[in-house]
């Protein structure tokens, strides 16, 4: 049966695949027929993701994308791919007056420098096939809105969205498309992992701010990645797609 969203015959590199959105992207890509190359910092959790993939021909390459030598190693070991899904990222809620160089380097380094440098090396080493697709998980923060304490996080994600537009323009000559998905709050462990725990009561309060009256789940984002990685989006490049349950409408 014809399916323009199929990833059959495509090889997709998925970063941040050991948990959260990245894990969901890897799983959904495998369900759509892709051979998936997964990478993440935590070897044990990366193995868990690998075990959940459907089909065969998948590869796992542990790497910390905040380390340039490890980015280089990942590119060396990675086969040629038809798509790249960038999901590695961290979040910390820190007011402006408490920002330090150390946590600025950590957040911007992981959320912006890592994906940008990985993309640069993949392009320079011709690891992305012509007519390929690059998708960045950015954020609603830094592009459409921002919340208290998110200035560093918003800056890192805003940088990523800006880079994606420039890359889309430059790589269009090779038929390579570059897009961003910009989710609002997605129910993952990203805040808990960083010690910024949002209580159930706070979550219920936040839900009331969304016209669709729920928070996002990982597949809300990973299905958008599948769309951008597939031929169904072959004439779309350089955009930021809000995935927010209608949040920016109010």
For the regions a protein language model found, what residue spans apply to each?
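Alpha-helical segment proximal to the catalytic Tyr-Lys
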Residues: 124, 169-170, 234
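C-terminal substrate-recognition "lid" of short-chain dehydrogenase/reductases
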Residues: 214-243, 248-249
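Residue(s) in the substrate-gating loop at a strand-loop-helix junction
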Residues: 139
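Substrate-binding pocket helix/loop in short-chain dehydrogenase/reductase
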Residues: 95-96, 103-108, 202, 206
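Active-site helix of classical SDR
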Residues: 119, 156, 164
């Amino acid at each position: 049966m014809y399916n323009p969203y199929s990833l059959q015959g495509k090889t997709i590199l998925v970063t941040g695949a050991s948990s959260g959105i990245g894990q969901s992207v890897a799983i959904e890509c495998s369900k759509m027929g892709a051979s998936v190359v997964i990478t993440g910092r935590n070897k044990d959790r990366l193995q868990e993701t690998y075990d959940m993939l459907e089909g065969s021909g998948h590869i796992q390459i542990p790497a910390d994308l905040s380390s340039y030598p490890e980015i280089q190693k990942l590119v060396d070991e990675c086969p040629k791919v038809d798509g790249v899904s960038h999901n590695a990222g961290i979040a910390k809620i820190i007011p402006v007056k408490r920002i330090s160089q150390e946590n600025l380097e950590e957040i911007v380094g992981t959320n912006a420098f890592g994906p940008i440098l990985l993309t640069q090396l993949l392009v320079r080493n011709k690891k992305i096939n012509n007519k390929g697709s690059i998708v960045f998980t950015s954020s609603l923060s830094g592009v459409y809105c921002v919340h208290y304490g998110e200035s560093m996080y918003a800056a890192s994600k805003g940088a990523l969205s800006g880079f994606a537009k420039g890359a889309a323009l430059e790589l269009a000559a090779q038929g390579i498309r570059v897009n961003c998905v910009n989710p609002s709050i997605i129910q993952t462990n990203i805040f808990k992992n960083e010690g910024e725990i949002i209580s159930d009561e706070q979550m219920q309060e936040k839900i009331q701010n969304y016209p669709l009256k729920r928070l996002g789940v990982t597949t809300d984002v990973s299905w958008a990645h599948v769309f951008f990685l597939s031929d169904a989006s072959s004439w779309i490049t350089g955009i930021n797609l809000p995935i927010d349950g209608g949040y920016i409408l109010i």
